[in-house]
Amino acid sequence: MKRPGKRWLWLIPCVLALAVGLFLLLRSCAASLSAPAPSAALLQAADGLDEIVLQAAFLPESRSLRVTQRMALTSRVDDARDTLVLRTWPNAYQSMETSPLTLTELYDAAYPEGFSTGALVMEEATVAHGDGAAEKVFYRYTDTAKTVLSLPLAQSWGCGETLTVTLRYTLMLPKAASRYGVMNGVYAVGNAFPLPALYENGAYRTDDYSPIGDPFVSECANFSLELTLPDGYQCAATSFPSETRQDGEKQVMTFSAPAVRDFALVLSQQFQAVQAMEGNVLVSVYAPDGNWARQALAFARAALRCYNELYGDYPYPSLTLTGSTLPYDGAEYPGLCLLSSSLTGDELEKAAAHEVAHQWWYAIVGSDSVNNAWQDEALSQFSALSYWERAHGAAARAEWYEQEIAPSLRITLNATAGAPLSWFSSLGEYKSLVYDRGTALLCAADELLGGRMNDFLRLYRERCAFGMASRQDFLSLLTEYSGEDFTPLFEDYLDTLITP
């Protein structure tokens, strides 16, 4: 056998270069930067909030997560209550009759393989009053969809008193392109963990899981999660993991998210991750397509930079976006934006701008997305318009307005922009009224304010951060800011049917 001559030596550096390149490529597919620590302002906002501690094991082979959830909930209302009500949204996915994805406009895209069942299978619930011992609770569901979980209390729950609630359950994900489901190797876990139902006017809110809009209303709390998942999976979440350690063939990730309204996550083996710091915020994008992820990262950073300047600094240490299979453009969670991976070019940039704006108008400033959906959707769309003007010029903004927003003022529909979600008969109707006509209202108010609407929105953010703002709160603050009564204008755009 002949020995290779020197002419083969040139291959050695090539092979080494190839190996280094492959190593760097594989390294680029995983997140490598870390998020900064929470700011003093965020920790101040988190002080005294309810605590929600989650331990979850992700089991991809069964499309499930096994969860233990512990909540320390303090009553802040005068009423003494004898029940605690939690919202268990995943149960709506159990049947065709209750799934939010069976709307005609969504079904084929959401269930390409046919209907698939999802659920939250409750195993045990215990409640402790104050420092007392935990007692098992015989819970019951009070609605057909099993999204309203009622826990009877052994003694009344008074103002200032704390309950410690412990739940054990399994989340079962449907095969569905959705905010809650599995499709193309991407596992979306949104609106999954049980949260206290909003309590107002002497009663718990028990809104239906509407297939239109975002029927989820919750107050800020401090979340933490310890997630066990198989090697090879990456996790995009409401916060960036503060620690990742190895446990045999599994990873254990630890997350902490102070002062947020919910905690969501998206997992996949196929994700490529790209990251960059934008000021003091770690911006990450996870998507199967690396080029798509890099585009989305650029758009997210630009939008974040714009809104920081317009509305005040984003308060959380991280902002994460994912490329997911969705039957709509996107979905928002605190610190996490889900975007349809089918979006490209201008449509991707507009969707990213809109979803990032939701970090101000939903995540930071909460509102009633069931009865006043315009208050986060129209504000986010108006913010995206402002971003579009900064990024592409006044003519580009005017073109967007004329093509997508102005037509909503000329069409006749059987609902109004200020209507509750149950009034809308289709996604198209909802978009035309809530997004477009709602944005037209804000543009009209901006004109009356001499172009100062974004200055007002900055004040709105300052006054209402981490709370829940009503329509009247918005109007009252606008009157205080401007010295004018905008009620007639709002009633015209939000409450008046356009007739032929």
Predicted regions, residues:
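N-terminal, polar/Ser/Thr-rich
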Residues: 7-66
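Short beta-strand elements of extracellular/lumenal beta-sandwich folds
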Residues: 63-76
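Extended, low-hydrophobicity, Ser/Thr/Pro/Gly-biased non-transmembrane segments
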Residues: 70, 108-123, 140-141, 147, ...
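Solvent-exposed beta-hairpin/edge-strand motifs
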Residues: 81-132, 228, 232
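Short Pro-Gly-centered flexible turn/kink motifs
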Residues: 158-167
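Hydrophobic helix-coil surface modules that form long, contiguous segments used
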Residues: 214-353
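Zinc-dependent metallopeptidase catalytic helix centered on the HExxH motif
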Residues: 294, 338-403
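Amphipathic alpha-helical substructures
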Residues: 395, 431-500
